[in-house]
């Protein structure tokens, strides 16, 4: 999603989707790097925000991208085609996106699930990686309310794995991400993550800043 080479209407929509992130979340925090070549971004899907978060991270890194979506859902939101969304029922189009060097965002659980451990992983992400060929990259994502007014999105990008190893690697990475979040004071940043997209400032953060200015 968010192909930087999209026509003008698509680019306008891409900017609007990034603003949605900035207004709805406290920020998007990232650990890890993607390969410089084409890649399958294979992530858990436990939040409404997941597709938007992936798009914002890839836009921030200036990576041309596409997102695989269920065909019925895409038919209901046809305008998303202009920002690189592809029907899951069109594998040739997905392969073409990878062969053009894009990052293809896919949620191999196949549906939006409640937050928790990874569910069953369908083989599609690995198949696309083998056929393109392209790197298969497990990406753990967690959107969570911590110690501030607005939720934080954490994106933990793993090194490339063999397609057959994707389920185990993504399961492990998601568990590691959840453990890292639990270990840290909810009011403090999680070590090792950088802010890729800054969003809303909580009232408590504003009050702290004002108090600091008054004391000067």
Regions found by a protein language model. Name each.
Residues 9-45:
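Helix-to-loop junction immediately C-terminal to a conserved catalytic motif
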Residues 33-89:
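Catalytic core of membrane glycerolipid acyltransferases/transacylases, capturing the structured
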């Amino acid at each position: 999603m968010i192909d930087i080479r999209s026509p003008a209407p698509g680019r306008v929509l891409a900017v609007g989707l990034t603003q949605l992130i900035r207004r709805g979340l406290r920020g998007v925090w990232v650990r890890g790097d993607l390969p410089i070549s084409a890649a399958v971004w294979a992530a858990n899907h436990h939040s409404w925000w997941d597709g938007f978060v992936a798009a914002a991270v890839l836009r921030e890194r200036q990576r041309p991208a596409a997102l695989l979506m269920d065909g019925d859902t895409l038919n209901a939101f046809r305008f998303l085609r202009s920002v690189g969304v592809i029907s899951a029922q069109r594998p040739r189009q997905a392969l073409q996106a990878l062969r053009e060097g894009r990052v293809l965002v896919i949620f191999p659980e196949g549906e939006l699930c409640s937050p928790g451990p990874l569910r069953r992983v369908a083989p599609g992400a690995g198949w696309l990686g083998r056929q393109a060929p392209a790197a298969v990259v497990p990406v753990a994502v967690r959107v969570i309310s911590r110690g501030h007014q607005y939720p934080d999105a954490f994106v933990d990008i793993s090194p490339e794995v063999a397609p057959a190893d994707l389920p185990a690697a993504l399961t492990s990475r998601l568990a590691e991400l959840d453990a890292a979040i639990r270990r840290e004071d909810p009011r403090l940043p999680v070590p090792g993550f950088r802010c890729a997209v800054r969003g809303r400032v909580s009232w408590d953060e504003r009050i702290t800043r004002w108090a600091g200015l008054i004391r000067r």
